[in-house]
Swiss-Prot record:
Annotated Basic and acidic residues bias: 40-51, 61-73
Region feature Disordered, mapped onto this chain: 1-109
Protein name: Putative MgpC-like protein MPN_503
Entry's family note: Belongs to the MgpC family.
Biased composition (Polar residues): 13-31, 89-109
Species assigned in the record: Mycoplasma pneumoniae (strain ATCC 29342 / M129 / Subtype 1)
Domain of life: Bacteria
InterPro entries named among the record's database cross-references: MgpC
Length: 381
């Protein structure tokens, strides 16, 4: 799951244009165009429920066949091939019952150990209509990483794939500062068939360096395991099963979907004519913050953070504008290997390794007193 540089994803011919845009917006020393992103997502949600474990995180390996197909190849043959390629895995009624018991016993307010709410559930691969898909019977992945296998390779616990011959899974993340080992919680659902571990929760819990749980919400701090260092709030009780992360987003790199991607990350949209791709339409109204630390104090989630500006992309809605389809994809990533690294990013002395639209926000301490409402409490002592 090693990432590749943006110029490999978009094509070498885009390098000059990225550099020109960076210069115009004073985004010097941004990680463009060599920013590394671990994978790209195309056509649909950034995750699927574990019983929809195909298709695909499409790993980027700069090839035109097998993994990392180009867009045209993916939309024609690639979209159907993972269905028959992924291993066949089944689930059991006893495991489903374990999920229900875990949910009923673990739903209380305040800081809850997610380990108390975790469960072991096998994966059943099915298509969007719910029917059993075809696939290999040797529990091996042939051509593509399906969702469950991609998560497993990143260290996410998918119990039925623990024997899959891939990268060993770490399985458990430790919340920094508190020494609390946690596992992913299950998603609340009225349907027994839907009582499966929340994939997005697992992805977050594995790919983050810090995590806290409060009043049914999981708040995390990203790391270089995902293409961004933004935080997101994941509500376990979302009945639709959609996460707030990249909801309703297509990432066809090199198109205006890059602009949509940035809009989704920042939680706002400059074109009010369509809100389907905006996080606000999904109930996430908090502004984006980069987080320096997380903790829970007296049932309040407290973290050190600074408010992110409008990360440099062209906000024009003019379809004829030359920058509309560029959207500065490099601004969506913050490589930890770039100059200054994580400390500069947190301190915000140079914005995203460079000024964010020439604005620099001071570090602040913020408190989530009620889910969805931010209260600035000033600097900590």
């Amino acid at each position: 799951m090693n990432g590749v540089a943006q110029d490999k994803v978009h094509g070498l011919e885009q390098t000059t244009q990225w550099n020109q845009q960076a210069s115009q917006k004073n985004l010097t020393n941004n990680p463009a165009p060599k920013a590394v992103t671990g994978f790209k997502l195309d056509k649909g949600r950034a995750y699927r429920k574990l019983n929809e474990a195909w298709p695909v995180y499409e790993p980027l390996d700069s090839t035109k066949d097998g993994k990392g197909k180009d867009k045209d190849g993916w939309t024609t043959s690639g979209a159907s091939e993972p269905k028959g390629d992924a291993p066949l895995v089944s689930s059991t009624e006893s495991q489903m019952a374990a999920v229900t018991d875990s949910q009923q016993s673990g739903h209380n307010s305040g800081l809850v150990s997610l380990a108390q709410r975790s469960t072991t559930v096998a994966v059943q691969k099915s298509d969007s209509s719910g029917s059993q898909g075809q696939g290999t019977t040797d529990n091996k992945f042939q051509k593509y990483l399906n969702t469950a296998q991609a998560l497993h390779q990143m260290g996410v616990i998918v119990p039925s794939l623990e024997t899959w011959p891939g990268k060993p899974s770490t399985g458990i993340a430790t919340r920094a500062g508190g020494g609390v080992s946690v596992q992913a919680a299950t998603r609340q659902s009225s349907s027994t068939n839907e009582d499966l571990p929340n994939v997005i929760t697992q992805l977050y819990h594995t790919s983050t360096s810090q995590l806290a749980y409060l009043n049914g919400q999981i708040v995390v701090m990203g790391s270089n395991a995902v293409p961004s260092l933004w935080y997101w709030v994941v509500d376990e009780r979302t009945t639709s099963g959609r996460a707030t992360w990249w909801a309703h987003t297509e990432l066809n790199w090199g198109t205006d979907k890059q602009k949509q991607f940035v809009e989704n990350q920042l939680g706002f949209k400059d074109d009010s004519n369509s809100s389907l791709t905006n996080f606000k339409s999904q109930g996430l109204t908090q502004p984006a913050y980069l987080i320096a630390g997380l903790d829970v104090v007296q049932d309040h989630l407290v973290f050190a953070a600074f408010k992110a500006g409008a990360v440099g992309y062209d906000m024009t809605t003019d379809s004829n504008a030359s920058t509309k389809d560029q959207a500065l994809a490099w601004s969506t990533t913050a490589g930890l290997d770039s100059a200054g690294g994580y400390n500069k990013l947190v301190e915000n002395t140079g914005g995203l390794n460079g000024p964010i639209n020439e604005l620099v926000y001071p570090a602040r301490h913020l408190c989530l007193c009620d889910p969805g409402e931010w209260d600035e409490r000033g600097e900590s002592e």
